[in-house]
């Protein structure tokens, strides 16, 4: 009887381990896909799944063009293997804030076994599994990473009758760092190389853009961004912008409001005038015509001199 019990236990254990083999294979596929994406340079990469759907989360930092980067990620996920008999979703982040998702649903009886890029549906909907996906631990986090960029800047104007152009050429190194989800700190330094007619302040090394921005996503697919700091065109203040695509994603609403004043850098000292602060705003809509890959915008706006217009 003891031998029978031992044999029964051994059979049960073997059956249990046999059942775990597919689960192990699924986990290895998901983890290996995440590792491959991280190796390519993607940030904030993770995955999860339930009985109906597998979800990958990623942020493109490897490719300058978002479309190219997302396409490369889709190719890798397809090559590593899609889940059998369940859908797959890719959620694309921007500074840890979800933007769009790509959704693939296998069709039963489809003679084509290999999925292609055209089989993925792109939308702003994140699906029900996002509630679980937002809790997973992401690999290759973008937080606290410092990006160093160098921008050559060329400006010219034609205001003097005796001179064709007045020219300003700067080198502008900048750093960007994110300290929490959706946040970005940008600090720029302007180093004058050639200045002909742009004034004595542009002869000095001085800061350029210094801003803190916060991106967020509200319910009903409302995207927002708030920025505080020193902007271009000798402006400082706060600016908020919002974007809301409709269910028919060819149509969308756009809104922006800012409260800014005039200021300038004298070396590393910032000179500003609070009495110049005023409200600017913009409200409009957009239509995308996919047949001709063309977008039309119509906006009513108030500008820096309090003039209003439509464009």
Task: Map each language-model feature to its residues.
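Bacterial N-terminal signal peptides that target proteins for export
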Residues: 2-12
